[in-house]
Every structure is written in C-alpha cells, then in structure tokens.
C-alpha cells in the first residue's frame, strides 16, 4: 500500500547506538558574529542575522543610488 512506510535497510547499517548518542561539544561550534541574530531586538523580534539584514540593502542596490544621481543645473 502507498500509505505504509517503506524502510530502507541500507541506512540502518550506517547508524548504530554510538553514532546516535554522539554529541558535538558546544564549545567547538564557532559561529561568526555577523551570522548571529541581533541580541537587542527592540523593534519586532526578527531572527535575521546582521549579515542577512545588510544583504537586504544590497539586494535592492540602494547603496548605489547616491553614485548615479545626475548633476543638477547646467
């Protein structure tokens, strides 16, 4: 039947109790500061990292607006 789960026996050979219980120590995980969410979320509770927030501006290319302004007058 389609509604029954078909288990793949090949994966069972790769996973044992020692592998399942193995944990990565917390102090070995190094996350760059720009990848972490803003710790002071006063304006709404966004979970975006600083890098993701900065990329919003580059997605729209707004940082180049001031460079492409035509001269006034003449």
Curated annotation (Swiss-Prot):
Predominant location category: nucleus
Keywords for this protein: Cell cycle, Cell division, Mitosis, Nucleus, Ubl conjugation pathway
Gene Ontology BP, a term: protein K48-linked ubiquitination
PANTHER family: ANAPHASE-PROMOTING COMPLEX SUBUNIT 13
Pathway(s) per entry: Protein modification; protein ubiquitination
GO CC annotation: anaphase-promoting complex
Organism listed in the record: Pongo abelii (Sumatran orangutan)
Record region (Disordered): 33-53
Keyword Cell cycle: yes
Summary of the function given for this chain in its UniProt record: Component of the anaphase promoting complex/cyclosome (APC/C), a cell cycle-regulated E3 ubiquitin ligase that controls progression through mitosis and the G1 phase of the cell cycle. The APC/C complex acts by mediating ubiquitination and subsequent degradation of target proteins: it mainly mediates the formation of 'Lys-11'-linked polyubiquitin chains and, to a lower extent, the formation of 'Lys-48'- and 'Lys-63'-linked polyubiquitin chains. The APC/C complex catalyzes assembly of branched 'Lys-11'-/'Lys-48'-linked branched ubiquitin chains on target proteins.
UniProt xrefs under InterPro entries: Apc13
Name of this chain's protein: Anaphase-promoting complex subunit 13
Compartments, record wording: Nucleus
Residues making up the signal peptide according to the UniProt record: none
Entries under Pfam families matching the protein: Apc13p
Recorded family membership: Belongs to the APC13 family.
Subunit annotation: The mammalian APC/C is composed at least of 14 distinct subunits ANAPC1, ANAPC2, CDC27/APC3, ANAPC4, ANAPC5, CDC16/APC6, ANAPC7, CDC23/APC8, ANAPC10, ANAPC11, CDC26/APC12, ANAPC13, ANAPC15 and ANAPC16 that assemble into a complex of at least 19 chains with a combined molecular mass of around 1.2 MDa; APC/C interacts with FZR1 and FBXO5.
């Amino acid at each position: 039947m389609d509604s029954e789960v078909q288990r793949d026996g090949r994966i069972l050979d790769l996973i044992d109790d020692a592998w399942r219980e193995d944990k990565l120590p917390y102090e070995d995980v190094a996350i760059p500061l720009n990848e972490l969410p803003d710790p002071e979320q006063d304006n709404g509770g966004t979970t975006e990292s600083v890098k993701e927030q900065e990329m919003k501006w580059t997605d729209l290319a707004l940082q180049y607006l001031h460079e492409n302004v035509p001269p006034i007058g003449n």
